[in-house]
């Protein structure tokens, strides 16, 4: 019994520490966002409504976690707007589709809805 426990602990200890698995990659999120577009156009397939809701729920979760910490909420911003911003951003970066989806969503929302201090820094950096 002790030998089995020691062996199990040793095997766990040999697992790579740097390995991680994100819930969604950018590619997986975009697949679900595309399903949402099909639903909106009335050409949805079986499972598209579920996939669309999953994508929107994921984006809403990222928004709720990072609002004010990274980007600023504006009165009247809808989940539909946040979803559209995310869809456009992820589509424009196919070379990053392997990255964690939460990271891409956060970047998309940060660029679309920067806090006032960040807006001023962006303007100064662009020479505006």
What are these regions (language model features)?
Residues 1-9:
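Sec-dependent signal peptide recognition
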Residues 22-88:
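Short N-proximal segments of mature Sec-exported proteins
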Residues 9-13, 110:
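Short N-terminal leader segment in a subset of presequences, especially plant chloroplast
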Residues 14-18:
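N-terminal signal peptide c-region/cleavage motif recognized by signal peptidases
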